[in-house]
Each structure stands twice: as C-alpha cells, then as structure tokens.
C-alpha cells in the first residue's frame, strides 16, 4: 500500500521549513507528499521546491485544495494533513496497519494533542478525541486517512468553506466505522492562544450548533475567520 500525504497551505512561510524537515523521513519511506497551495503571497511555494515534494496549485479553499491533491495522488491511501500539524514518526506504518487487508475499516484518524502554554489545551484535545470515538466524526486536525477508492466513492470533500471534514466523515461512516490510531498528532494551539481558550471553545461549539441547525457553511466561515 502506498500513502499519499496531502497538505493544503496558504501563506505558511514561517511553518514550511520545519514542516519539510518533519516530512523528509516519510519521503524516504516512499510516501508521496503533495502540497497544494491556495494562492500564497509570502513565498511559501518557492520554499517547497525540494526533491520528493510535489507542489500543486488550486483556488483558495481547503476542501478544494485537498480534492486537487487527491486527484493528483497515486497512492492507494490518502492522508490529509494540516500544515500546522505534526505526524508521529511511524505514521506511515501505523496507517498501513490500520487499513490492512484484514481491516473492516476503510478510513480513520489519529488522536490529537494541542500544543501550547495553556494547560486547558490538553483538556480540549482529550475531549476532541472522546467526541470522535463517540460520534465517528473526525476533524481535520486529527489527520484523516482513507482508502482512495472509498474517498472517491464518498464524493470527495464537499467544496464548502467550513465543516468539510464533518461532511466527509458523515459519508465515510456509512461505509465503515473509522479506526482511531492511539498515537498522537500534535497540532498548533496558536488560534486558541491568540483568541483565548474559552472564547475559542465557545466559538467552535456555537459554529457546530449553528451548522447542525442548517445554517450554511458559507455564512459561518466569516465568524470562524
């Protein structure tokens, strides 16, 4: 099984050098790395032009960027990674084991840990992991992975401005329950620190509640930004 790791970016010049260093071992393990730019203006794309990394360009919008990357991918497994999230060292092996030929699941996600100074971020990450196990809904911060055939069968990511990960999870859980890898991905807590942990918690829950009530993602995206 070959893994294609798809990373949407937009103006991530400060993060790119460390991201590339984190991904080099996976390149050496024959993972395909596809970075899809959404119109960066800070030189991000030029920084990525190294052997082993494929650069694609798409219109702005994370869902659209990930779909473009998936269309380009040659792997049998797709792993969608946010630019500010770090995979564990053996991520490729863990994913292959999770989706082995005798597995009943066609998709899954990692546990997540939110990095940052506030101790409350550990609690937030813990609650995210519990919620995913109970609801079978994963978020992009948890590095969703899926067999490419099932991703295509589910219709790919809906090209909306927000909640595309929730919609994909809803479609995939009809096909099978997700596999949760107990190892952790580490995602940045910068948004939480800038805007305040409790303020961000309330915002996220309000957005999810409003989305559940039927408010379009296009209307919610402005509040998220």
Regions found by a protein language model. Give the residues of each.
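A conserved acidic beta->alpha catalytic loop
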Residues: 37-45, 85-86
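Conserved donor NDP-sugar-binding/catalytic core segment of glycosyltransferases
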Residues: 90-120
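Short beta-strand/loop segment that forms part of the nucleotide-sugar
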Residues: 20, 24, 30-39, 56
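Hydrophobic helical membrane-anchoring modules
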Residues: 170-225
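Short, well-formed alpha-helical segments that are part of the catalytic scaffolds
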Residues: 11-25
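Short aromatic/hydrophobic "clamp" motif used to bind/position activated sugar donors
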Residues: 78
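Acidic helix N-cap motif at the loop->helix transition within catalytic regions
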Residues: 14-18, 42-50
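Conserved donor nucleotide-binding strand/loop of the catalytic core
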Residues: 31-34, 45-72
């Amino acid at each position: 099984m070959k893994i294609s790791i798809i990373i949407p970016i937009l103006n991530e010049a400060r993060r790119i050098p460390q991201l590339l260093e984190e991904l080099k071992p996976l390149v050496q393990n024959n993972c395909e790395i596809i970075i899809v730019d959404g119109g960066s203006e800070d030189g991000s794309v030029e920084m990525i032009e190294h052997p082993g990394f494929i650069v694609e360009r798409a219109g702005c919008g994370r869902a659209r960027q990930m779909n473009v990357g998936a269309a380009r991918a040659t792997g049998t497994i797709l792993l969608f990674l946010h630019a500010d999230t770090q995979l564990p060292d053996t991520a490729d092996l863990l994913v292959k084991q999770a989706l082995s030929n005798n597995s009943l699941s066609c998709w899954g996600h990692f546990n997540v840990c939110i990095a940052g100074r506030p101790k409350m971020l550990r609690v937030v990450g813990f609650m995210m992991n519990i919620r995913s196990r109970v609801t079978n809904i994963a978020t992009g911060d948890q590095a969703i992975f899926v067999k490419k055939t099932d991703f295509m069968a589910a219709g790919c990511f809906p090209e909306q401005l927000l909640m595309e990960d929730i919609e994909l999870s809803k479609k995939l859980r009809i096909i099978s329950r997700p596999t949760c890898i107990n190892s952790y991905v580490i995602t940045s807590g910068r948004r939480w620190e800038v805007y305040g942990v409790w303020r961000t918690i309330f915002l996220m829950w309000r957005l999810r509640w409003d989305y559940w009530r039927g408010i379009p993602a296009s209307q919610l995206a402005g509040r998220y930004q």
